[in-house]
């Protein structure tokens, strides 16, 4: 028979709770494609990229419609990372055109550093070519320091000016900072820009 507790009796209920295993954390939304390769980006897949058949060169149109910046993927220094807000690749190449290929002159040789926001090629501002990229250093997830070498005088003199510039991803865009940023921006405005 069941009896009800009296006024001086206490009923104690014990609740057993099992802790569910924590759900695995997903990758951040920004790193939606952690397995992406640089070859999967617009640098290689853009319909504006001009492949050169029979060679390992890829031509990227410039802001001068008849010129192309030609580079070999085998001669590219890639620091592409689809899970970082800012990564880069240095392209070593030459100016030329679609019919004749590289110009083959000393003044046509150039470097371009292209930047990526996660797995997206940054095209605004457009990448600018310069005589040489002397060095690139990551200063943080959103900051990359580039030492740009500019041939400010004759081709025979080679690099005559050095610009140390911090390229920073801030507020949804790529900006330049540092003591040489204004001088670099002036030179970049006068050089060929890629239009990937």
Which residues fall in each region the model found?
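Solvent-exposed, non-transmembrane segments of extracytoplasmic/periplasmic domains
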Residues: 29-128
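Short, intrinsically disordered low-complexity segments
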Residues: 129-130, 148
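Extracellularly exposed regions in secreted/surface proteins, prominently low-complexity, repeat-rich
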Residues: 135-196
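Short, low-complexity, disordered segments immediately C-terminal to signal peptides
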Residues: 2-28
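Exposed, interaction-prone regions of secreted/extracellular proteins
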Residues: 125, 133-134
């Amino acid at each position: 028979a069941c009896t009800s507790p009296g006024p001086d009796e206490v009923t104690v209920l014990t609740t057993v709770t099992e802790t569910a295993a924590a759900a695995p954390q997903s990758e951040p939304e920004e790193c939606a494609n952690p397995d992406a390769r640089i070859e999967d980006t617009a640098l290689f897949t853009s319909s504006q990229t001009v492949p050169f058949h029979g060679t390992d060169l890829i031509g990227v149109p410039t802001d001068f419609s008849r010129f192309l910046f030609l580079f070999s993927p085998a001669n590219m220094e890639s620091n592409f990372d689809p899970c970082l807000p800012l990564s880069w690749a240095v392209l070593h190449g030459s100016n030329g055109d679609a019919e004749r290929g590289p110009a083959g002159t000393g003044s046509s040789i150039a470097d371009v550093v292209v930047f990526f926001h996660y797995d997206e090629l940054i095209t605004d501002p457009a990448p600018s070519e310069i005589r040489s990229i002397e060095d690139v250093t990551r200063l943080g997830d959103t900051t990359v320091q580039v030492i740009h070498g500019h041939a400010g005088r004759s081709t025979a003199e080679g690099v005559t000016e050095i610009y140390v510039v911090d390229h920073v991803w801030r507020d949804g865009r790529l900006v330049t900072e540092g003591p040489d940023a204004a001088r670099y921006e002036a030179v970049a405005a006068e050089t060929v820009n890629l239009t990937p």
